[in-house]
Amino acid sequence: MDVTAKYELIGLMAYPIRHSLSPEMQNKALEKAGLSFTYMAFEVDNDSFPGAIEGLKALKMRGTGVSMPNKQLACEYVDELTPAAKLVGAINTIVNDDGYLRGYNTDGTGHIRAIKESGFDIKGKTMVLLGAGGASTAIGAQGAIEGLKEIKLFNRRDEFFDKALAFAQRVNENTDCVVTVTDLADQQAFAEALASADILTNGTKVGMKPLENESLVNDISLLHPGLLVTECVYNPHMTKLLQQAQQAGCKTIDGYGMLLWQGAEQFTLWTGKDFPLEYVKQVMGFGA
C-alpha cells in the first residue's frame, strides 16, 4: 500500500495497545476496498485522552476506535451519542464530521451479531454476563434491545460496581429485559445463575495475556452442555474459559467473532462502504 497525501487517518486509542489486531484487520480491509485511508494505533490512557481528542480534531482525522481504558471517559468528549451508546455509557467508535464528533458503540452489536451468526436465537433467553466495563455493558445493552429476557451481571466490588448498578437501572427503565447485579464473590449465587442460564459471556480481560491462565469460572462442573459460552478476549484465541467450556460440552464462540463484526460496523461508519467480510476472515484466519 502506497500512502499518499490524499489519505485520511483513522486511529485507535487504547492502553495497552500493541496486542491489538484491529490495525492489521482494518488496513487489510481498506486496501482491499481501494479506499484512501490508513489506520494507526496510538497508546492513549485516561490522562492523555483529552489531548488526543484535540489532536484528532486538529489533524482532521476521520475518526478513531476507542478501547480500554477509555471507553467510558470518551462519552464526555463527543458532541452526540447514539441511543444505544447512552444506554451503555461507553463508546468504542468516534466519527469526526468536520469537527463534530459522534460516538457509537459497535462492541454490543458486534458480539450479538456473532452469536446470531452461530445460529443461536437470543430472544427470551437468560445471559450471565461477567464484568461491567465498556465491552460488557455494550453487549448487555444490545442483548436487551434485541430480546434477552434477563441478564445476570456479576462483577467484583471494584470501581465498576456502582457503574454496573447504574447500567442495570438504565436498562431496566428503557427495555423489557430484567438486569440484576451481584458481587462475583458470591459464588453460590454465581452457581445458581449458571444453572439456569442459556448464555455465559466473559466481558472482562481475565483470560487475556498476561492473565491467560486464569478464568472467572473456578469450578468446571458449573458449566453444562446446554450453555453457550462466548468470549470477548481474542489474545490468546483459546482462553482458559473456552477450554473449560469445551471440556464441559458447551458450544463456544471465541473473541474473533466480536472483533470481526464490531470492526465491520466501524469500517462502514468511517468510510460509508461495505466491509469486505469474507476476504478479511480469510486473510486474518478468523474461523479457520
From Swiss-Prot:
NAD(+) binds at A132, G133, G134, A135, N155, R156, R157, D158, K205, C232, V233, Y234, N235, G255. One of its GO terms (biological process) is chorismate biosynthetic process. SUPFAM superfamilies: Aminoacid dehydrogenase-like, N-terminal domain, NAD(P)-binding Rossmann-fold domains. This is Quinate/shikimate dehydrogenase. Pathway: Metabolic intermediate biosynthesis; chorismate biosynthesis; chorismate from D-erythrose 4-phosphate and phosphoenolpyruvate: step 4/7. It catalyses: L-quinate + NAD(+) = 3-dehydroquinate + NADH + H(+); L-quinate + NADP(+) = 3-dehydroquinate + NADPH + H(+); shikimate + NADP(+) = 3-dehydroshikimate + NADPH + H(+); shikimate + NAD(+) = 3-dehydroshikimate + NADH + H(+). Belongs to the shikimate dehydrogenase family. Substrate binds at K71, D107. The actual biological function of YdiB remains unclear, nor is it known whether 3-dehydroshikimate or quinate represents the natural substrate. Catalyzes the reversible NAD-dependent reduction of both 3-dehydroshikimate (DHSA) and 3-dehydroquinate to yield shikimate (SA) and quinate, respectively. It can use both NAD or NADP for catalysis, however it has higher catalytic efficiency with NAD. Its EC number is 1.1.1.282. Homodimer. Keywords: Amino-acid biosynthesis, Aromatic amino acid biosynthesis, NAD, NADP, Oxidoreductase. The keyword Oxidoreductase applies. One of its GO terms (molecular function) is quinate 3-dehydrogenase (NADP+) activity.
